[in-house]
Design a protein with these regions (language model features):
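A solvent-exposed interaction/effector surface
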Residues: 1-130
Length: 130
């Protein structure tokens, strides 16, 4: 969607402002690139109106004590147990459908994750608070 693409273009063009705050793995690589989501109330509940209305934050996973520089926002996502699926066209709807069939409730907003090493995208469906 155009709005998300604009957010990512903006985040990527200013990444140098937060690169030093990014969480790193043992090899010094960035741990994760996230499209974090929340409901409008910012309580990290699922998007409303058939998953069409909510907030989206394009960014990088940062060290816990990071303070967002000017122009950036820090979200601290609650801890959940997730169902994780590789992100392909139609996977969101397919996974929600399968969860409904299996009686599994979505307890928070779904997040986009991009593995910086492989470039593969994943969807994280929160199913239980931890």
């Amino acid at each position: 969607d155009v709005y998300k693409r604009q957010l990512w273009d903006d985040a990527n063009s200013h990444f140098s402002e937060v690169a030093h705050l990014a969480k790193k793995d043992a090899n010094g690589g960035i741990v994760g690139i996230w499209g974090a989501m929340s409901d409008i109330s910012r309580s990290f509940k699922p998007w409303e109106d058939g998953f069409s209305k909510g907030l989206y934050l394009a960014g990088v996973e940062c060290v816990d004590n990071a303070e967002a520089p000017d122009g950036w926002i820090k979200w601290t996502i609650p801890s959940y147990e997730y169902i994780v699926v590789e992100n392909h066209k139609g996977m969101f709807e397919e996974t929600i459908g399968q969860m409904n069939e299996d009686g599994i409730s979505l307890v928070g907003a779904v997040h986009d994750y991009t593995d910086p090493v492989t470039g593969k995208g994943y969807l994280y469906f929160p199913i239980r608070e931890v």
